[in-house]
């Protein structure tokens, strides 16, 4: 007869555990009841929670977008947000965890998780985007508008020496180049900024932010200006710009906010970086006066013939001012924070600015991380798909 292994026997609770268990149960019950009450109040009384997404179809139901939308809406309920903030703070202070949306690399370098995701239908979604861009390029060409696609490489690609324990899959190595080749085969003008930014290394990006630094933005703007010149386009209206640099000052990073740590005292957050800001101003004078002709009754000559659509990259670190200085002309900025691949394009093509004063060159800035994410075709010209 084999001897019984006492190590497999259940551990009996201690007297302390027995005494505290009713209190723990009451605390847990109170917490759950409070959370339920807060959610019911938000749904039934406050009117601040929309249970259904704007567009409801079978794809949204099959892909779980409805439950995802509800969870996202309920996350903004005051009690839920406070509880989430406390959880994020405890995880960060105890074990250095930055949450599901942010990864921590070397020495307080933060990276966006979206850059590292392997999407289930990556190839199909990337191809759908390429087909869309090619179709739009053809439509724009018929209107006399030239399209220049500008690919912004991932921070985790360019600042790879700062990844440390953060892993970037080999499957992502050729993501941008593969997409660029597909577009070029379709006759689309593409500028990949990776060769421009790679020599800068980690200096090209901000440490606690998803976006490029001013060094990276300025170098990228120069590359875009060089490509525009190669297209034989003369940017208008011609302007002159002067620049000055401020003393370094603290710059909050958006990755700290995405990690849910921006509400903590600064001393408990990931170390904030000090950034010198370039101030670029237009010089008023002879260039502007010479540009005004006698037949320019409505000031059309002062409207930019270059326009930019894209994401928050075009709205950060002075990219547009650097571009204006590099081309020597004003540039229309129609980029959209959080717009991802389609947001800015969709808004711009339906706007009076595009319909009434279309540009000669449209610069479409696209982050690499958006190339393979789930895609829904929602960009139209004149009410028709591109």
PLM feature spans:
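Extracellular glycan-modifying ectodomains
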Residues: 1-386
